[in-house]
Swiss-Prot record:
One of its GO terms (molecular function) is organic acid binding. It comes from Notothenia neglecta. This is Hemoglobin subunit beta. It comes from the Eukaryota. Red blood cells. The keyword Iron applies. Heme b binds at H63, H92.
Length: 146
């Protein structure tokens, strides 16, 4: 993947200001609510019976934060994203059996929550760079499935 200086700067800036404790739980909760079939991977998280339960679930919140911090790996390794996520790709495909399409669904939810948080500062240029970054990470996470 070729990254322009502008794209690198945008990605670095977004993550340097990221409120992980807010965005992570909101993004994962949104994914579990909007795409309820994704809940099957979180059966050990307790009550996920409705939106209110998901939004108040401490396990969902903690995992959302963990997932969002997982993107730091990509930010720090933008030129070697596939290598950076090789181990996680293997874990999700061979042990957890996560449908790789779920990574795209979660990335869309992350984009929505980041856009809501940034408001008018989430310009088309910023969205383009952010979604490109997430698409590369999603592809890397799905690499083991190919």
């Amino acid at each position: 993947v070729n990254w322009s200086d502008s794209e690198r700067a945008i990605i670095t800036d977004i993550f340097s200001h990221m409120d992980y404790d807010d965005i992570g739980p909101k993004a994962l909760s949104r994914c579990l609510i909007v795409y309820p079939w994704t809940q099957r991977h979180f059966s050990g998280f307790g009550n996920l019976y409705n939106a209110e339960a998901i939004l108040g679930n401490a396990n969902v919140a903690a995992h959302g934060i963990k997932v969002l911090h997982g993107l730091d790996r990509g930010v720090k390794n933008m030129d070697k994203i596939v290598d950076a996520y090789a181990e996680l790709s293997m874990l999700h495909s061979e042990k957890l059996h996560v449908d790789p399409d779920n990574f795209k669904l979660l990335s869309d939810c992350i984009t929505i929550v980041v856009a809501a948080k940034m408001g008018s500062a989430f310009t088309p240029e910023i969205q383009c760079a952010f979604q490109k970054f997430l698409a590369v990470v999603v592809s890397a996470l799905g690499k083991q499935y190919h």
